[in-house]
């Protein structure tokens, strides 16, 4: 009776080599597809479990601990505050520039022809 893996000293056939290669390539492609792409914004908030869960289902909810939840809410509040501050600054600049301002033009004097007198001849 032969062992379950086949004969011991027999080399692999071409078909078996191709099948092994196919399985290896397919598994590599699957790993690439399931890999989460994107930079981790905040290492304190995102853990490897979150990334794993994102890979399996992008729509799944992620449970956060109280500390991480507070930190995330604080980040959102600060972002909204900055956005509101930027919106307030933008209209103030536009109102000032909307009114036409008179341009001050420099007066350029036309060069006048001046007759140069020879000082040597007079003396």
From Swiss-Prot:
Residues 1-33, 82-123 are annotated as: Disordered. InterPro entries: C11orf98. Residues 18-33 have a biased composition (Basic residues). This is Uncharacterized protein C11orf98 homolog.
């Amino acid at each position: 009776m032969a062992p379950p893996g086949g004969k011991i000293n027999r080399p692999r056939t071409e078909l078996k080599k191709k099948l092994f290669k196919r399985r290896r390539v397919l598994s590599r492609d699957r790993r690439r597809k399931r890999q989460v792409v994107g930079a981790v914004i905040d290492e304190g908030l995102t853990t490897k479990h979150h990334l794993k869960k994102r890979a399996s289902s992008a729509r799944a909810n992620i449970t956060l601990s109280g500390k991480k939840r507070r930190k995330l809410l604080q980040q959102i509040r600060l972002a909204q505050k900055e956005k509101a501050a930027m919106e307030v600054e933008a209209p103030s600049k536009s109102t000032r520039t909307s009114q036409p301002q008179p341009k001050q033009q420099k007066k350029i004097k036309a060069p006048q022809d001046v007759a140069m007198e020879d000082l040597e001849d007079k003396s």
